[in-house]
Amino acid sequence: MRWLDGTVTVEDSVGSSISLGGDLLRTTFLPSITTVTLGLIRMRDRSLRLGPIPLITFGPPKMSSTSVSWPIEGGLLVASAGGRFTIESAGGHLRATLDGYRPMLPRAIYEATQLRLHHGLVRVQLLRLAGLPPSQAQPSPVSRAAATAIDAAVCAGLALVFARRHRVRVFTGIAIGYHLASWSTSGTTLGGRVMRQRVASIDGSRISLIQSTLRLAALPLSALRRYPAHDDIAATTVVKDTPV
């Protein structure tokens, strides 16, 4: 990240096993924000919108054989028009660069809030487009189910110990905090440790708090669709945690 005269330049990059053309990047990257925000933010009329509110409005995109770039023209999160947002597929990497953007928020608040969300969501989108195979061997469905059962038992036990009333609410709160803390620190819960498995980004790296939050929020969708939509949305996978 670099600041210059009130404008900021931010870059995120992930390895990629495929090469993507500029037109494909144009039609997939920004629209996929709807998926990774679970419908909260949508791309419409070249604007990223939260409900009816345009957060960032872009001008017409410019494309090359390996990249697409949108000029920034306005929106609630933009202090003044200027700068560009570019996605490039080259050299075995997918790279997103926000260059010359002037945020509406003061620098300290921007760095503590919007910048963190930007890094987290952009990285998820890049990983989802990167076409990477799982970095390690994956545990069997039976092993995953056993780990889930252990974690549910742990959370239920804590709820029984610490709550005499509203145990369902307490169980829910404990389960949320337990999984978010476990996934975004070590990648593994108590059930995962017992069954020797952990959650990782699809490139093998530790998952972020944003990925953990997306994964947990999308779990009901996985149950409805009967496939791991939570891993697809958060760009995560469960891998065997082999002792060194």
Regions found by a protein language model. Give the residues of each.
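Hydrophobic ligand-binding cavity/cleft-lining segments
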Residues: 1-65, 138-141, 145
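A broad, low-specificity signal marking well-ordered, structured residues that form hydrophobic/aromatic
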Residues: 8, 68, 94, 197, ...
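Generic structural motif
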Residues: 13, 73-75, 90-92, 101-103, ...
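Hydrophobic-ligand binding "helix-grip"
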Residues: 49-91
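Beta-strand/loop substructures that line and gate deep hydrophobic ligand-binding cavities in soluble
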Residues: 79-112
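Hydrophobic pocket/interface hotspot
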Residues: 96, 118, 151
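A conserved amphipathic terminal alpha-helix motif
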Residues: 108-135
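Membrane-interfacial and juxtamembrane segments of integral membrane proteins
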Residues: 128-244
